[in-house]
Curated annotation (Swiss-Prot):
GO terms for cellular component: cytoplasm. Residues 343-546 are annotated as: Linker. The gene is clpB. ATP 2 binds at G606, P607, T608, G609, V610, G611, K612, T613. ATP 1 binds at G208, E209, P210, G211, V212, G213, K214, T215. It comes from Bradyrhizobium diazoefficiens (strain JCM 10833 / BCRC 13528 / IAM 13628 / NBRC 14792 / USDA 110). Its main location: cytoplasm. Homohexamer. The oligomerization is ATP-dependent. Residues 393-525 form a coiled coil. The keyword tRNA processing does not apply. SMART domains: AAA, ClpB_D2-small. This is Chaperone protein ClpB. Part of a stress-induced multi-chaperone system, it is involved in the recovery of the cell from heat-induced damage, in cooperation with DnaK, DnaJ and GrpE. Acts before DnaK, in the processing of protein aggregates. Protein binding stimulates the ATPase activity; ATP hydrolysis unfolds the denatured protein aggregates, which probably helps expose new hydrophobic binding sites on the surface of ClpB-bound aggregates, contributing to the solubilization and refolding of denatured protein aggregates by DnaK. Residues 161-342 are annotated as: NBD1. It is found in: Cytoplasm.
Length: 879
């Protein structure tokens, strides 16, 4: 016996058999050990051959194990020393001779099994013979497995049944009802069939964005082949999906991968056109399996593709096709591209309606039609970095999974009741130990309460169980119905019309009636939701994108008509600006503005401290329920020419290329927010060139070539240009003349093509003395909020409010001096009083003014004399 003449798998089995003999304490290494490890093999090569040869592999394995249990065991000093049984040596000789006779260079696993049958005097040979496995039958099974191939390498077994190992039969999956229905895509499927029907280069490649349904087209073709809805040239074909991962996995030695792929190609080409190979992610062929001097997978495919022997359908994305396949012109010319475009929202709704039954059956909940429409429309509007129908299907799937999880969990009402029962039982046990009258009285009351709660809990639990059972029964019926429909389709294909009639007019209608009865039973006051609605879809969108659900589902008219009132609570004295912003947003939301532009783009002009940035924060909070839903860029940081790359990311080859830009990354991660360009006039002119595309098309390409969507952002730019005209404007004077002066300065600084793209240029006027009181109240409310946790309540009377307003008013500096006044005269004394213990948690503090100081509960603060606050330039006008 020359072990080098055995294949790797044969050697592995011989070593495993030897280890088994040692482990069991047997003195002889016999044919029984070899047969046992051959039949224990996970891949089942030997077991499969025995079954093909007319034997029963399970019965033979049982007989082998029984025989091994009867073999004497050796323990003590002689244990571990084993000897080769003479019949096993003869078995190896017989296997080698059988291999040589068949033209093999190596002894394979099946020859080893054949050797066991040829050595009839051995125990294993006897078991196989009794099991009905003869050398003649086994030889015939081996020939059928090998299909004329000889074992020329140490990994020869990898080539057996290569398609079963490395490919998935899509046509069989279609027959078994394991494929989702394919709705639409008729044009692409027809074009694929057309290319497959060509004489040469009959290999289509489906090219499209991720998630548009390329793989679904291949599955649709498999369904059509099964249903006979294809030309004669494609009838009875088998569509096989190649698993490149399985081909590469475990290929340790050089040439092993090529051998596996070659075996697949030989089976496909040897079938004389019966098999069509589908290669998903086709670009992975390029370089797959390539090592030192080895050929990659694509080079092995080229000859068969060019001759038309190999029918192949590829699928890859546009980017990967351009990056990998187009560079290899010899491979690209052998494929005929078929471009798969993204379906429209209407087509997506049709696709979802076709898939609905499968998802209802899987999750065990109902999916309403409004949920399907919401999935398509909301995903199209709000999830911009992915493609239909994939993103819409994901929405529907996740919403159904979320509802199913809620259905399986205990309802909140029942859960809180059960927790209350546990709490009362603990109290009951504690009261039983007390002997006073009060405790006994409380115990009686508690026991009555406990009985009532337990009865109510039992009733609710019964209701909940009934509702769960109803859903479970419906799910089982749907699964059974699905199986019967697959059975009906197969019966019709096979021409078994009696069976088809029984199914179509008997069992299926009966199950449909039962299902309708279950779904018609409406429980009064259901404890849990049983159907996925548009609201559930909106909640999932909210979790994915950060858009508040209530804002999306609230009526647009009601929401937007309240806008001025809401913004006016935070921004004082700028009614014109608030109105201009509200009308622009209303115009955008009403669909009267180009949907491919941002929601709105505004330029706020005015002096410092009048509420430009505050209005931006108020907008973010109102539109997105979150003041932080805003990316703020201080344009004083973008004064140099090279700083433009910080906005959109460094170009390839520069440091920071992988990091992305400050603007593009912020919007890409959170597409729904306010974008604030503060002090826009300080930016370098090249920054405005970048913004032109954003303002006009609502999109921007970053340094890595990704398109970032700005259509759902609100763009605001603030500037102090012309503020001196606004500050010096006398109260009550017409603003049109001042506006012209300000706009003259703006036009002198910004280029016309930039200004022309801004929706509104809004003037903020200086704050009037009469408006300061409201600002004091807003600032005071924020201070009160800081003390909420301490339960300290502040009250501010009119005199104190007027005192603070007078101290903080400055026409040149707006409301910012007021913030400093409140900090100095209100917050600082309060902080010292809290630290000194004069004001404790839960106290009420009344703030008033006496003379030139504020009093706290009638007392002036016990601190060093507070210096008079001189508001800078209160009387001075800016030149």
């Amino acid at each position: 016996m020359n072990i080098e003449k055995y294949t790797e798998r044969s050697r592995g089995f011989i070593q495993s058999a030897q280890s088994l003999a040692v482990r069991e304490g047997h003195q002889q290494f016999s044919t029984l050990h070899v047969l046992k490890v051959l039949l224990d093999d996970n891949e089942g090569l030997a077991a499969g051959l025995i079954d093909r040869a007319g034997g029963n592999s399970r019965a033979i394995l049982k007989a082998t194990e029984d025989a091994l249990n009867k073999v004497p065991k050796v323990s003590g000093g002689g244990a571990g020393q084993i000897y080769l049984a003479p019949e096993l040596a003869r078995t190896f000789d017989a296997a080698e001779k059988a291999g040589e006779k068949a033209g093999d260079s190596f002894v394979t696993v099946e020859r080893l099994l054949l050797g066991l049958t040829l050595e009839k005097t051995s125990e294993a040979g006897t078991i196989l013979s009794k099991g009905g496995v003869t050398p003649q039958n086994l030889n015939a099974a081996i020939e059928a497995l090998r299909k004329g191939r000889t074992a020329d390498s140490a990994t020869a077994e990898n080539a057996y049944d290569a398609l079963k190992k490395y490919a998935r039969d899509l046509t069989q999956a279609a027959r078994d009802g394991k494929l989702d229905p394919v709705i639409g895509r008729d044009e692409e499927i027809r074009r694929t069939i057309q290319v497959l029907s060509r004489r040469t280069k009959n290999n289509p490649v489906l090219i499209g964005e991720p998630g548009v349904g390329k793989t679904a087209i291949a599955e649709g073709l498999a369904l059509r082949i099964v249903n006979g809805d294809v030309p004669e040239s494609l009838k009875d074909k088998k569509l096989l999906s190649l698993d490149l991962g399985a081909l590469i996995a475990g290929a340790k030695y050089r040439g092993e991968f090529e051998e596996r792929l070659k075996a697949v190609l030989q089976e496909v080409t040897g079938s004389e056109g019966t098999f069509i190979l589908f290669i998903d992610e086709m670009h992975t062929l390029i370089g797959a399996g390539k090592g030192d001097g080895a050929m990659d997978a694509s080079n092995l495919l080229k000859p068969a593709l060019a001759r038309g022997e190999l029918h192949c359908i590829g699928a890859t994305t546009l980017d990967e096709y351009q990056k990998h396949v187009e560079k290899d012109a010899a491979l690209a010319r052998r494929f005929q591209p078929i471009f798969v475009s993204e379906p429209s929202v209407e087509d997506t709704i049709s696709i979802l309606r076709g898939l609905k039954d499968k998802y209802e059956q899987h999750h065990g909940v109902r999916i309403t039609d409004s949920a399907l429409v919401a999935s398509a429309t909301l995903s199209n509007r709000y999830i911009t970095d992915r493609f239909l129908p994939d993103k819409a299907i994901d929405l529907m799937d996740e919403a159904a999974a979320r509802l199913k999880m809620q259905v399986d969990s205990k309802p909140e009402e029942l859960d809180s009741m059960d927790r209350e029962i546990i709490r009362l039982k603990i109290e009951q046990e504690a009261l039983k130990k007390e002997s006073d009258a009060g405790s006994k009285s409380r115990l009686q009351t508690l026991e009555k309460e406990l009985v009532e709660l337990e009865e109510k809990s039992a009733s609710l639990t019964a209701r909940w169980s009934a509702e769960k059972n109803k859903l479970s029964d419906a799910q089982k019926l749907k699964a059974e119905l699905d199986g019967l429909r697959v059975e009906l389709a197969n019966a019709q294909r096979r021409g078994e019309f009696q069976k088809a009639g029984e199914l179509a007019y008997g069992r299926i209608p009966e199950l449909e009636r039962q299902l309708a009865d279950i779904e018609a039973k409406e429980n009064s006051g259901e404890m849990m939701e049983e159907a996925v609605t548009a609201n559930h879809i909106a909640q999932v969108v909210s979790r994915w994108t950060g858009v508040p659900v209530d804002k999306m589902l609230e009526g647009e008219k009601d929401k937007l008509l309240k806008m001025e009132d809401s913004l006016g609570k935070r921004v004082v004295g700028q009614a014109e600006a608030v109105h201009a912003v509200a009308t622009a947003v209303r115009r955008s939301r009403a669909g009267l503005q180009d949907p491919n532009r941002p929601m709105g783009s505004f330029m706020f002009l005015g002096p410092t401290g009048v509420g430009k940035t505050e209005l931006t924060k108020a907008l973010a909070e109102y539109l997105f329920n979150d003041e932080t839903a805003m990316v703020r860029l201080d344009m004083s940081e973008y004064m140099e020419k090279h700083s433009v790359s910080r906005l959109i990311g460094a170009p390839p080859g520069y440091v920071g290329y992988d990091e992305g830009g400050a603007l593009t990354e912020a919007v890409r991660r959170r597409p729904y927010q306010v974008v604030l360009f503060d002090e826009i006039e300080k930016a370098h002119p090249d920054v405005f060139n970048v913004l032109l595309q954003v303002l006009d098309d609502g999109r921007l390409t970053d340094g890595q070539g990704r398109t970032v969507d700005f259509r759902n952002t609100l763009i605001i730019m603030t500037s102090n240009l012309g503020s001196e005209f606004l500050v010096n404007q006398p109260e009550g004077e017409d603003t049109s003349a001042v506006r012209e002066q300000v706009m003259g300065m703006v036009r002198g600084h910004f280029r016309p093509e930039f200004l022309n793209r801004v929706d509104e240029i809004i003037l903020f006027h200086r704050l009037q003395r009469s408006e300061m009181g409201r600002i004091v109240e807003i600032q005071f409310a924020r201070l009160q909020k800081l003390l909420t946790d301490r339960k300290i309540v502040l009250t501010l009377d009119g005199a104190a409010r007027d005192w603070l307003a007078a101290k903080g008013w400055d026409p040149a500096y707006g409301a910012r001096p007021l913030k400093r006044v409140i900090q100095r005269y209100l917050q600082d004394p309060l902080a010292e009083m809290i630290l000194a213990g004069d004001v404790k948690d839960g106290d009420n503090v009344a703030i008033s003014s006496e003379g030139n100081v504020l009093t706290f509960n009638g007392k002036a603060p016990q601190t060093a004399e507070i210096a008079q606050f001189e508001a800078p330039a209160s009387k001075r006008k800016l030149n």
